[in-house]
Amino acid sequence: MNPVYSPVQPGAPYGNPKNMAYTGYPTAYPAAAPAYNPSLYPTNSPSYAPEFQFLHSAYATLLMKQAWPQNSSSCGTEGTFHLPVDTGTENRTYQASSAAFRYTAGTPYKVPPTQSNTAPPPYSPSPNPYQTAMYPIRSAYPQQNLYAQGAYYTQPVYAAQPHVIHHTTVVQPNSIPSAIYPAPVAAPRTNGVAMGMVAGTTMAMSAGTLLTTPQHTAIGAHPVSMPTYRAQGTPAYSYVPPHW
């Protein structure tokens, strides 16, 4: 191998950071390159039935016989052009195709003749490195972003004790709970004594009570005009309202 194009050495294991193993699949690079097979069809493979080999050869012979007319007079006459077909070859092709997909007793579908009629292998799920709890269960509400904070704080939902969860079915909301609290507004900064102090100064060097006295005229409440809304009625349709 050319180390420039293939830096991986033969027989080196595959990169498997999650240590997932699949039955029947190799876990490392092959030790040697596979032998060159000049044939297009792997006839020596057990999954390639002999019927398929005969079917391929018979079909190729049929195409070669249909390629050119056998007599030269058919080209000059006008009308329907009939290709000469070997009846025996067509019959053999049909027999080969029916033998390749023959019906095996006891199975509801057709199987190749090389496949055994035994019980299927037991179900083995693929190893999943992720836990099931990472994927939320579907609900009637759209999935919200787990890290997005809306205009309201949600009431924390706590799980019950393990023995209660074990013997009961606990259904918790996948989205915002019914009890919501408005987000608290940060209080305005107070005019404390420490506000006027600079790093490296003392209390005697600060302005003291001068910064604590109000320096401006208090502004009254701003009048807000509330529009008149229509009376609450029964809607003609029902839908799930968004949470925010």
Curated annotation (Swiss-Prot):
Top-level taxonomic group: Eukaryota
Keyword Acetylation: yes
Cystine pairs: none
BP term (GO), one: positive regulation of base-excision repair
Positions in coiled-coil regions: none
Region (Disordered): 107-126
Keywords: Acetylation, Methylation
Acetylation as UniProt keyword: yes
Asymmetric dimethylarginine modified-residue sites: R102
Positions where N-acetylmethionine occurs in the chain: M1
Disease: Associated with cisplatin (DDP)-resistance and radioresistance in the treatment of lung cancer as well as oral squamous cell carcinoma and poor clinical outcome in patients.
Function noted in UniProt: In cancer context, protects cells from induced-DNA damage and apoptosis. Acts, at least in part, through PI3K/AKT/NFKB signaling pathway and by preventing POLB degradation. Decreases POLB ubiquitation and stabilizes its protein levels.
Family: Belongs to the FAM168 family.
Record's subunit section: Interacts with POLB. Interacts with AKT1 and MT1X. May interact with FAM168B.
This protein's name: Protein FAM168A
Gene this protein is translated from: FAM168A
